[in-house]
Regions:
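Non-heme di-metal
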Residues: 1-150
Length: 150
């Protein structure tokens, strides 16, 4: 989420300054989470690279893993869904991890992510305009608030 929220803060800055600031502030929390996970990996004797294990191999994370919507509603929905997925993942991990200290860290991070969910839901309610239909040409609209200018 760090790279995505950085991107989102940039493309929303000019026309949605408050949204941009929310992404900046939430991103600071997400960077702290990344730091916590990195330090935890080191303490557990693991290399803190940005990679994951899948089907017997290590795969590096890259920004191409992100989705980059530019419609304000889709952008906020994507961020909200990412937070919800993270909460589910951390809950699942806390179920099988036996170390109480690590579970406590996960629970603290879950609390942060739940706050982010509330923030994104609040922002979505402010921008509750329907998205233009993708199967037809969008009509000219005098209201430029549905798409983040690029």
């Amino acid at each position: 989420s760090v790279s995505l929220y950085f991107y989102n803060s940039l493309i929303t800055r000019e026309h949605y300054h408050d949204v941009s600031e929310c992404f900046n502030r939430i991103n600071l929390v997400e960077m702290r989470h990344l730091d916590i996970f990195g330090e935890l990996a080191l303490k557990l004797g693991t290399d803190p690279r940005l990679w994951s294990y899948n089907k017997g191999r290590m795969y590096y994370w890259c920004p191409g893993c992100n989705q980059y919507p530019t419609q304000i509603h889709a952008l906020l929905t994507n961020a909200l869904e990412g937070e919800i997925q993270a909460i589910r993942k951390y809950h699942a991990q806390s179920e099988w991890i036996e170390d109480g200290h690590i579970r406590s860290i996960l629970n603290r991070i879950i609390a942060d992510e739940e706050l982010h969910v509330k923030i994104f839901r609040s922002l979505l309610s402010e921008f509750s305009m329907p998205e233009p239909e993708t199967h037809s040409e969008p009509a000219e609209s005098p209201e430029p608030t549905t798409q983040v200018p690029t």
